[in-house]
Amino acid sequence: FGDGQRDTDTFETILEGIVLVQYGISRPGETTLSIVHAFGHGLTRTDDVQQGAAHAVVAPDVLEYLFEQAGVDARVGLLANALGVGDAADQAAAVVSAVTEVRDALELPTRLRDLDGPEPDDFTAVAEAVLADSFMANVPPGLDPTVADIEGVLEAAW
């Protein structure tokens, strides 16, 4: 976006995006930060991992996990429309693909093994930290992840 231009229109659009994102996560008396952010906390709790990098790596796998859970409204249609893939036959796969494309276009890390962070032997402790994170209170209704579920997401992201 902006093709590298540093003009007023580009900066106004960027600022608008920042404000909309912040409104989306922070409201008076509540937050909408949820499972992806909890993963970020779990992955950065003891290691020298930048939280944004952790989010970039796990977001596609967390979304895939959410979309696979029966009876959980992960708002796939809303996400698909927001990402411009609302007409896709498989909206869940299209959302995961779109998020992956954004991450890759930003040249962010794609695998946990590429970060200076936890190793697979640490995944149980990371999963326990994710589940204990306060933002897990904001997961979609009906989602009740286990340590094994979280470890599975971490293994997929490895």
Model-derived regions: residue spans:
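Active-site segments that bind and position negatively charged phosphate/pyrophosphate groups
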Residues: 1-91
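C-terminal charged capping/lid subdomain of soluble metabolic enzymes
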Residues: 82-158
